[in-house]
Amino acid sequence: MSQDPHNGKGTFEVHKQPQPGLKVFRKGKYIDPKTFQMSPALIRARRPFFVRNMLALAGLTGFVAGIYGYTMYSLRTDDFGDVPIPPLDPEEIKKLQSKYSDDSKA
């Protein structure tokens, strides 16, 4: 049975327990604190997973490169000739020409 935290006075009692200090940078058990290199135990523990991780990395890299390559291959033949371009007023063309000619001089 759980206790109701309401104390009958319209307020709640808050029981604060002392919190240990927040340690942002904890000492690693398997890393040398002076050189920040992995210990031999950590290297031995990671060794069985190395080949599997590298194969997964190669697979994901190949998959992403394949998608990118297929996208570039598919889009290289698209000329966007069917997209209508709205006509511009001669005043707007002069404005744009003066704007971009000023930018190129600067």
From Swiss-Prot:
Residues 84-106 are annotated as: Disordered. Residues 91-106 have a biased composition (Basic and acidic residues). It is a single-pass membrane protein. It is found in: Mitochondrion inner membrane. Keywords: Membrane, Mitochondrion, Mitochondrion inner membrane, Transmembrane, Transmembrane helix. Residues 1-48 are mitochondrial matrix. Pfam families: Coa3_cc (PF09813). GO terms for cellular component: mitochondrial inner membrane. Residues 72-106 are mitochondrial intermembrane. The keyword Transmembrane helix applies. One of its GO terms (biological process) is mitochondrial cytochrome c oxidase assembly. The chain crosses the membrane at residues 49-71. Required for assembly of cytochrome c oxidase (complex IV). Belongs to the COA3 family. Component of 250-400 kDa complexes called cytochrome oxidase assembly intermediates or COA complexes. This is Cytochrome c oxidase assembly factor 3, mitochondrial. It comes from Yarrowia lipolytica (strain CLIB 122 / E 150) (Yeast).
